[in-house]
C-alpha cells in the first residue's frame, strides 16, 4: 500500500510558507499561508502556556506527519491488533439506579452531588413528558438544578454537563426546544448571541474549533481515515473528483492535497462542495472562499487542482444532475455527519445525497458519523443515553487538557451546549421516536458494499490516538471490516466507514 513520501512531508511547513513547491511562486504570492486560516486566539485568556497549542493547519499536518512517520517502519513488522475488553459495551437502563452508575461523577468534590444532579435531571425529563407530565414540577426541579450547577471553568465536569442539560430542559419547558435543529448550532444559541457580539461569536467559534482539534481526535480521526482510503482507492487514477457534502472551511482536504502533491505522478484533484441556498449568500460566499484558499494551497505545492460548488435545492435536496461531471474521473463521495463542529443536517437531505451517489456509481463513499446508543424507549430513556454519551465526551476532553479549564469551557459552550439543546429538542418533539439507525446500516440496505479498511489505515488511526490520552481506542467492525470506531473507554463516540456501489466492485 502506497503511503505518502515522508521526506516530502518532513519538508513541508505551514508556519509561514512552504519549502516544498514545484513552482517558483511563494505561498505569500498566492496569499495562501495556512496561518491565515487559523483564528487569532488570545491564549493569555486561557490557563496554561500558549506553547501548548498550535495553529489549526499546522496541527493537522504535524499530526498527520507524526502518525505516518511512526506508521512507515511498522507496515512490514506489525501485525494487526484491535484493543478489546471482556466487557460488553455498557447499555443504559431505564431505572434510575443503573442510569446514575453509568454516568461519570468523579472529581465533583462530593460524589453524592453528582448522583443528585443525575437524579434531578432524570426527574426533570420525566416531568416534561409521559404519564407523569407536570410542568409546574419541572419548573421547580429546574430551579433547584440551576442552584447546583455551573458552567464556570472551575466547575466540575458533571456540574458543567448538568448545566447544559438544565438549559436544554429549560428550553423545552419554555417551548424553545430544538431551536438549533435546522441551522448551524453555534450560530443559533440565543443566549450566547445576546451576551456576545457577532464578531466575538465568530472569533470564539474559530478558537473553539482550533482547541477541539488540539484537545481530541474527534475531527482528525474521520478526516485522516477518509483521506487515507481515498488515496488508496485512486492510486492508479489520472483524475479524481470528490463531492463533499459539508465542506465547511475545507480543513479536511489540506492533508489530501499534500499527499497527492508528494507523488510526482499524482492525479488531478477536483473538489465539488455543496452549498445551501437556505442560509443565503453567506453560505455560498463561505464555500467560494474555501475554494479560493484550497486552490491557492494546491498551487503552492504544484498539485493540479480545481474547485466547484453545487447548490442544493431550497429544501437541501441533492440532485445528481446539478453536478458537472467529466468522463474518466474517479468519483468519490465524502459525507461527514454530526461531528461536534458541524451543523445538523436533516435525514431527508442526507438520504438524497447518498441516493444520488448510488446513481453515479462512485469509486468510493466515505462516511463519518456520530455513534448513537441502541436505547429503545421514549424521551426519558433517550435523554439519559444522551447524558451518558456527553459524559464520556466531557470526560475525554478533560483527560486531554486537564489544566486548560477555560479552554474546555469555551469548546463546551460554543459546540456542545447548543448541540445538546438541538438534539434533545428533536427527541422531545418526536417523543423519542427520532430515527436512530446509522447511515452506514442504511447504505448496506440500499445496495452499497463495504470496502475493507486497510492495514495501513487502521494503524494510522491507532497511532493518531496515541497522540492523545490513553482512554481512546479504535475498533474495526462493520461489513467486511469496513468501519473504524472511535471509543472513549467503553463508549462509542463516532465512526468512519468505507463503501462502494456493487456494480463498481471490479474497479477496486
From Swiss-Prot:
Domain of life where this protein originates: Eukaryota
Domain GRAS: 108-500
Keyword Nucleus carried by entry: yes
Expression induction or repression: Induced 24 hours after treatment with Nod factor or Sinorhizobium meliloti.
Pfam families recorded: GRAS
Annotated stretches, region: Leucine repeat I (LRI): 115-190
Region spans: Disordered: 75-98
Gene Ontology MF term list: DNA-binding transcription factor activity; sequence-specific DNA binding
A GO biological-process term: nodulation
Tissue specificity comment: Expressed in roots, shoots and leaves.
Motif (VHIID) on chain: 240-244
Keywords assigned: Endoplasmic reticulum, Membrane, Nodulation, Nucleus, Transcription, Transcription regulation
Region VHIID, residue ranges: 209-273
Record keyword Iron present: no
GO cellular component, one term: nucleus
Compartmental location: Nucleus membrane; Endoplasmic reticulum
Protein family according to the UniProt entry: Belongs to the GRAS family.
Function: Transcriptional regulator essential for Nod-factor-induced gene expression. Acts downstream of calcium spiking and DMI3, a calcium/calmodulin-dependent protein kinase (CCaMK). Transcription factor involved in the control of strigolactone biosynthesis in roots through the activation of the beta-carotene isomerase D27, which participates in a pathway leading to biosynthesis of strigolactones.
Subunit structure: Interacts with RAM1. Interacts with IPN2 and RAD1.
Protein name, per record: Protein NODULATION SIGNALING PATHWAY 2
Lineage of producing organism: Eukaryota, Viridiplantae, Streptophyta, Embryophyta, Tracheophyta
Amino acid at each position: 500500500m502506497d503511503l505518502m513520501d515522508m521526506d516530502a512531508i518532513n519538508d513541508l511547513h505551514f508556519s509561514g510558507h512552504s519549502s516544498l513547491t514545484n513552482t517558483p511562486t511563494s505561498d505569500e504570492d498566492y496569499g495562501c499561508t495556512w496561518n491565515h486560516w487559523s483564528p487569532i486566539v488570545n491564549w493569555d485568556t486561557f490557563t496554561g502556556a500558549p506553547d501548548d497549542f498550535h495553529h489549526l493547519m499546522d496541527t493537522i499536518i504535524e499530526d498527520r506527519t507524526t502518525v505516518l512517520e511512526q506508521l512507515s517502519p511498522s507496515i512490514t513488522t506489525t501485525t494487526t491488533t484491535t484493543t478489546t475488553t471482556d466487557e460488553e459495551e455498557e447499555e443504559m437502563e431505564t431505572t434510575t439506579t443503573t442510569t446514575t452508575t453509568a454516568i461519570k461523577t468523579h472529581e465533583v468534590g462530593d460524589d453524592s452531588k453528582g448522583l443528585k444532579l443525575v437524579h434531578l435531571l432524570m426527574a426533570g425529563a420525566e416531568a416534561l413528558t409521559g404519564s407523569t407530565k407536570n410542568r409546574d414540577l419541572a419548573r421547580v426541579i429546574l430551579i433547584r438544578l440551576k442552584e447546583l450547577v455551573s458552567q464556570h471553568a472551575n466547575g466540575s465536569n458533571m456540574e458543567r454537563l448538568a448545566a447544559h442539560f438544565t438549559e436544554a430542559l429549560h428550553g423545552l419547558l419554555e417551548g424553545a426546544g430544538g431551536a438549533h435543529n435546522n441551522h448551524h448550532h453555534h450560530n443559533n444559541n440565543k443566549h450566547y448571541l445576546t451576551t456576545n457580539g457577532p464578531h466575538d461569536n465568530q472569533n470564539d467559534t474559530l478558537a473553539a474549533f482550533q482547541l477541539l482539534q488540539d484537545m481530541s481526535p474527534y475531527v482528525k480521526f474521520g478526516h485522516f481515515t477518509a483521506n487515507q482510503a481515498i488515496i488508496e482507492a485512486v492510486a492508479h487514477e489520472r483524475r479524481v473528483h470528490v463531492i463533499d457534502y459539508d465542506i465547511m472551511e475545507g480543513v479536511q482536504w489540506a492533508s489530501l492535497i499534500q499527499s497527492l502533491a508528494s507523488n510526482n505522478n499524482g492525479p488531478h484533484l477536483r473538489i465539488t462542495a455543496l452549498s445551501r441556498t437556505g442560509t443565503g449568500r453567506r453560505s455560498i460566499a463561505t464555500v467560494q472562499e474555501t475554494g479560493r484558499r484550497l486552490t491557492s494551497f494546491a498551487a503552492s505545492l504544484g498539485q493540479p487542482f480545481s474547485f466547484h460548488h453545487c447548490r442544493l435545492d431550497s429544501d437541501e435536496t441533492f440532485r445528481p444532475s446539478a453536478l458537472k461531471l467529466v468522463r474518466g474521473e474517479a468519483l468519490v463521495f465524502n459525507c461527514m455527519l454530526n461531528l461536534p463542529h458541524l451543523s445538523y443536517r436533516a435525514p431527508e437531505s442526507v438520504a438524497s445525497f447518498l441516493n444520488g451517489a448510488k446513481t453515479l456509481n462512485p469509486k468510493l463513499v466515505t462516511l463519518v458519523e456520530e455513534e448513537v446508543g441502541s436505547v429503545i424507549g421514549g424521551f426519558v430513556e433517550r435523554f439519559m443515553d444522551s447524558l451518558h454519551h456527553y459524559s464520556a465526551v466531557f470526560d475525554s476532553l478533560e483527560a486531554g487538557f486537564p489544566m486548560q479549564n477555560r479552554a474546555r469551557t469555551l469548546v463546551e459552550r460554543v459546540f456542545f451546549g447548543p448541540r445538546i439543546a438541538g438534539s434533545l429538542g428533536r427527541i422531545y418533539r418526536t417523543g423519542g421516536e427520532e430515527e436512530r439507525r446509522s447511515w452506514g446500516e442504511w447504505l448496506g440496505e440500499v445496495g452499497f458494499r463495504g470496502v475493507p479498511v486497510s492495514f495501513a489505515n487502521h494503524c494510522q488511526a491507532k497511532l493518531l490516538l496515541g497522540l492523545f490520552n490513553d482512554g481512546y481506542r479504535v475498533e474495526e467492525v462493520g461489513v467486511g471490516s469496513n468501519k473504524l470506531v472511535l471509543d472513549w473507554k467503553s463508549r462509542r463516540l463516532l465512526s468512519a466507514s468505507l463503501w462502494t456501489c456493487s456494480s463498481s466492485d471490479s474497479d477496486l
